[in-house]
Amino acid sequence: MKKIIFLLWGTVLMSLTSFAQQAGGITHSGLPTHQPPFPVVSYQELPNPVSVDASKWKGAKGINLSWGSTDVRYKKEEPAPLSRVQQVIDLKAWRGERVAAQWVVWTDQPLQELKAEVGGLKLKGKKAEIDRSHILSGFVRYVMTDELNPDGRGGCGHRPDASQFDSTLVADPIDHLTPSLELPAHSTQGGWVRVWVPADAEPGVYTAEVAVKNGAKELGRLTLRIHVDSRQLPAPKDWAFHLDLWQNPFAIARYYGVKPWSQEHFEKMRPYMEMYRDAGGKVITASVIHKPWNGQTYDPFETMVTWMKKADGTWFFDYTIFDRWVEFMMEVGITKEITCYSMVPWRLSFQYYDQATNSLQEIKTKPGDKEFEEIWTAMLTSFAAHLKEKGWFGITHISMDERPLDAMKETIRVIRKADPDFKISLAGALHEELSDDLDDYCVALRMKYSQEVKSKRKREGKVTTYYTSCEEPFPNTFTFCPPAECEWLGWYAARENLDGYLRWAYNSWVIEPLLDSRFYTWAAGDTYLIYPGGRTSLRFERMIQGIQAYEKVNMLKSEYVKRNQKGKLKKLEKALELFDEGKLPQESAADCIKKVKQRLGF
């Protein structure tokens, strides 16, 4: 049986090998990278398509250093637009919270070895400190991006010709692996400092120094102060926020050139899935058919379940890979939910191994067809028995996305026939008549659940969330979006009393994700939030900050209700009303968040 299972990966492995043999990389946009493909530790950014405007540097002489803003993607070719140099920055944090600051250097002369050294944070007047193990420091590197569609209404649609879109280098990857960078004259470089305050930290003001150097020569020092409150955030595993970012294990196998589902593959995946866990990730993404989304990503989702039609016409299903994937993710710490895609794939085509002909075959069938009901009743009956044996049945969802109402109704009927207790999830359009059948319901930002539906689902313990995709121009998570829009997402969930947020792609990397985030379908960055080498990003970091805000808001709500502090509760709810997507981008997400934080004392 193992021979049959791994036969299905032959095509994948051949494509991995061909890429590994390339002498130099090439991006989705056809740009040569002039370096080995698929870099992990060190790499060179692509040339900047925007030339330096000397007039903008007239007032920026010498080497300049300052704290900047985490709301800004500083342009590589322009001096930082700061009205004054800021040498000290003050941040507020609860115990257990992550907070971050961005420093920035802009220089009219070359720097051969720019680096930053961050010391531990010491508590004023006491011996307590937050040591370096709680601090992430890295350069904010540059990646190629593009823009919204010409009509400004979103980022959906094929983009076969990159020249039709304005392409620039943009700050996004946070590179904690590169110890130093060489900067040419007339360039700007940001650096990130993130502190994860220990849950048992003593409240008070903690101070650290950031020394920025060019080789051995110190360019300057910046002071970071964190005001730690006595309140405490729970650990991410205990966050209420339901974060569902679809993981793509196949992208990691391709990028690292390892055999899918080998021990090495799991070792390469671990850092990325730990990052997802530490962001509060709750859901394991499983593909139970071949290409449930018709290969829309560069690295298509292959099936984790082997489908075999035996010579006698009966069906056999092998769950070896599915089990290994789920067990691995649970070992990492993702244990709340398993979503299995999809009974209604985009092509309505199902691949299986045919024992009689010793070949791979396809069945094309749709909900409502007799054949559809027969094959899925067989599969789901087998699957339910297997899940019950493993102890996973209660957390496993049969999942669909963006499917028509009639197809959903028929699919639900087939699921209930196979096992009436199966849980079902949908990420798609709002159909309130489906709500009772959906244990996990996620609709697009523009669609609004009625208060009645939200309240009923809350009472029944069902998950109710929302998503953004390529359709929303604002807010979104493209690499050219203002970083604060990623934080806005968590705040909005708090305003709407939703359980969380879904984004369809955590790590569906393009060919060279560290260098060029553009894709031949959709706006740049739509397919991934994190980078090779276990690198985080401005987008991912700000998303986590929004999730933390959600947790803090809900903790305060519970406290105010318990203590009957109606005035404080009303003030909080009034502040949350500012999170209205209709006001973006005229009022920026950054300004909105700043106003609300000031009102709430965050």
Language model regions located:
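Catalytic domains of carbohydrate-active enzymes that cleave complex glycans
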Residues: S349-Y352, L360, K364-F372, W376-L430, ...
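Mature N-terminal, pre-catalytic/accessory segment of carbohydrate-active enzymes
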Residues: S18-N294, W392-F393, Q586-F602
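Substrate-binding cleft of secreted/luminal carbohydrate-active enzymes
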Residues: P482-Y528
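Short, glycine/acidic-rich beta->alpha junctions
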Residues: R95, E267-K268, F317-I321, D406-A407, ...
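Bacterial Sec-dependent N-terminal signal peptides
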Residues: M1-G25
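Aromatic- and acid-rich polysaccharide-binding/catalytic face
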Residues: F422-K448, Y467
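Aromatic-lined carbohydrate-binding surfaces of glycoside hydrolases
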Residues: F165-D166, I174-D175, S187, W196, ...
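Active-site clefts of carbohydrate-active enzymes
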Residues: K458-W488
